[in-house]
Structures are given as structure tokens and as C-alpha cells.
């Protein structure tokens, strides 16, 4: 199956609905052939529908003439069969066109979601610092579905409506110029209304998609942090923000749907007005002998065929506006700046020893606000290194730079003498196991969660890791043991979740380990269990520990004390206490009341 075209550079983001529609056309290029076939079928179905009233007029005239001279049943039956054949054929080719278009649009949705998924893996971490999860989810689900359904309902409809409108107009004038002018004159109002409604609804569709993304982002944040919201008594504040976003979504959705919903009843009114006008003028012309009765019957059908395209065109344009608004958000996401290409990075370490060097590292999240000013440190293989400091000192930032989640402003980070900037990011990531403060588990079995990211792991390896962290007995008491499903309803404590992620890191068996405040979310009793598990995990590996509780890093081989992006002290626990500097201040503040 074909993938859609890749996203463009950040300087080429769609600026408006028009450009996003052009981008959609480019994205549809792999399916031009089936789309053309679908449109041809639609054209055939439309043309058959257009000629049917003419055959109906012949049938009416034959019956009308036969009332005086005798009805020719063979001719009547033949006319009926022809009309049935026309309508059946028109429906068959129209169904075929719909089938093809639905298939294409589902492939388009699949391709877009695939492109978004691939894009997520290429985005730098700084993108996720500024965008909510809910907004990204909204683009993957709501916006892509809007594009797919809107294009599916509008492309063939628009073509059919235009062809039907032009074809019926030609046939009406060829049949009776005066009745044609009557039908068109009564429909001019429809054109005016359509132009007004489409011009007014465009901006509201754009606002609706944006507000929907804001809503998803807020709900996701409040759901994931509902305990914090309650604990801080911020329920009213959260509700106030929800009400604000909900009001914005309500207003934009109401306005867009109101203008869109006006089309059908207004077009229905125009159609009924056309029926009345045609009947009055047609009756006058029939009585004067200018036209036959069958022509009036045909024109009543033509009025419907003439006015329907107006409402269909309006609805199709409205759907295209909705697709364009959703396309702006999707293509804006796909056009986000990606991480620099590292395919040219050929450096590789066959056997990782674990020596790490930071050389005059300088970095910041904002161009004019450096966080790490001039960081240098040497870590020997197998050392247990703790990084401590006040909140905002740059501890986690250093680990993110080590993992090459961000690119340095200047300086170098080396692993076994090789700069990480010369290695592929995936190779750098494979060198580290991570246990973070915020545990991440997914819907799946315990076994699948523990073996995550490590193909070919045996059941014995999974169970051995769980025995080392003290989880094996608990898991085996579950109804299905290691095959028990883990989900939001699973009653795992914070400590058990942390032990599970430590077991995952053990199974991964990476040569270096990063422990980012892994005990900060557990109670003191559980901390002992988690600490023992982490000690087993770090044994024989170079390990980096970002510590909040300094009691957990007293046995570290090297403690780096950071303040405002620089190392201000380094040494062992005893050495740093003896210096009486920042480390002693941090340590004393935690234990002075104990």
C-alpha cells in the first residue's frame, strides 16, 4: 500500500484552506487513477439520470395521445422498460463510483495516520514540550476522519452536481426556452444564498477544528492528572477552563453547522418555488398549444434535477471547507521541523565499555536562554554517577543531551571516545536502559510490558528479571500469571509499577543505565525495595542517577552537584559533606528534621 508524500519543511506550512486543499490534491496523487474511474462512473450515472425525464415525457405523451386514438400497450411497456433500465443502470454505476471513492478515502486516512505516526518518531523532543497530547490525538483521529469523510462525500457529489446542472440546463433550453428561463429565474435566489452561506461558514469550520484540538488537549491533561487537580483543590479552576474551551467549541460548531444546515431547507424552498412557477407557466403554454403535456411533466423532473445540484454544490463546498480546515492542522503537523537526518552518522561502537565524557557542553531550550553553560565531566566505565541539584539546575537536561534527544549548542559528549553526534540516535538509545519517575505501561500482558522493545526475549528471562526485583511472586498470584492483562483498571501501586519498569530495563540489558528520580513517587518502605532493585540493575554498568532523595545515592562513586547549568562540586558523599558546600546544604535540608 502506498504511503502519502512526506511532510515538508517547517517554512512551508499551509497558511490557509486554499493551500491545504492544494496539498490534499498532491497527497491524493497515488490514487488519481481510481478517482478518475469513480468520476467517470459518476458522470455516466448523472447523464443517465438527465435523459430519464425526456423518456418520461415520451411515455406521458404516448398515454395522452392514446386516450383519444387507443393506447399502444407494446409501446407503453417498451417505454417503461427503457425508463427502468435507465434508472437501474444509473444507480448501479453510482454505487460503483461510491464504492471506489470510499475505498480511496479509507486508504487516504490510513496513509495520513501512517505519515503522522512516522512523523512523531522524527520530531525533536522540543516539539512535545509545546504541544499537548490531546491536540496530537485530535489531528490523528478527528482531523483525519474529517478529511476522509468530507472528501468522500464531496468530490463525486461536486462533479455530479456540476455535470447535472449544465446538462439539465442544456436539455431544458433545447426542450422549451420559456420554461427553462422560468426554472432558472426561480433558482437565481439559490445561487445568492449559496455564495453568502459558504463565505460565512469558512472561518467557523477552521475555528471548530482548532477548538476541538484544544478540547482534546485539556481533557487529556485533566484525565491524566485528575488526582493532582483534586489534591490541589483546582477542580473549580479546571471546570472554568473546560467551560471556556467548551463554550468556544460550542459557538464555532454551532455557527458552522447552522450555516451548513441552512442549505437544504433553503434549497428545498427554491425547488418548490420552481415547481410552482413551471406548473403555472407550463399550464398556460399547454393550453395555448405551444408545448405538450408531457413536456410539463418532464420539466417538473428537470426543476428537481436543476435545483438539487445547487444544494449539493453548497453541501460539497461546505464539506470541502471542513476538509480544508482539518487539512491545515494535519499538514501543519506534517510540516513541523524534524530532527536533523543522521543517516550519514556512521560511527559505531561494537562493544560498549561505558566511558562517558562531557566536554564544555552548552545548551538551552530557547535560543537566548542557555540552561547548560559549560558542563564538563569524565565518567569511567562501571561508575555509579549521581547528579543532584535544585529544581531547574539542569539535571534531567544533561541526561536528555546524553541520549541525544536534543542537539548541543556547542561542546561534545563522547561514549568510549566516540562523539554521540557522529552516531545514529537509535544506536545511542540502544546503549541505555531507562527508569523514569513517571512510569509508562501500556495495555497488554505483564509479559509484553516487561519484554517491550526487546524482540526474542524468552519467558525465562522475563521471570528471572521479575525475581530479581521481587515481583515474581505477586505476578504468579494473578489469575493468568504473566499473561494477565495490564490496563487502567489494574490495581498496581506506584512501587509495583516502578519495579515493573526496572524489570523491563533488566531484560533490555543495556550497557548503561539512567535512573531519573525513580524513587521520588514511592513511600519510604517501598523505596527500600525499589532501591535494592535499582542496585541490582546498575551492578556492572555505568549508571546515571538523577536523585531527589539524597539518601539513595550515598554509595555513588561520583556525585556531580549542579547549579544553574554548571557543575559546582563533585566527589563522593563523604568528600562533599566535608567541603561544606551546596551538597551539604541540600543533604542537611533533607535530614535536619529526622
What are these regions (language model features)?
Residues 20, 28, 60, 101-105, ...:
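Juxtamembrane loop-to-helix connectors within ABC transporter transmembrane domains
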Residues 1-52, 64-82, 97-101, 105, ...:
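Membrane-integrated ABC transporters
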Residues 66-67, 72-74, 171-185, 255-328, ...:
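Helix-loop-helix
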Residues 30, 34-47, 51, 58, ...:
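Transmembrane helices of ABC transporter permease
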Residues 342-343, 349-594:
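ABC-type nucleotide-binding domain
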Residues 125-126, 142-151, 155, 200-221, ...:
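An intracellular "coupling" helix at the cytosolic face of ABC transporter transmembrane type-1 domains
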Residues 45, 49-53, 85-86, 90-105, ...:
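Alpha-helical transmembrane segments
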Residues 3-12, 106, 114-138, 142-144, ...:
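Short intracellular "coupling" helices and adjacent cytoplasmic loop segments at the cytosolic face
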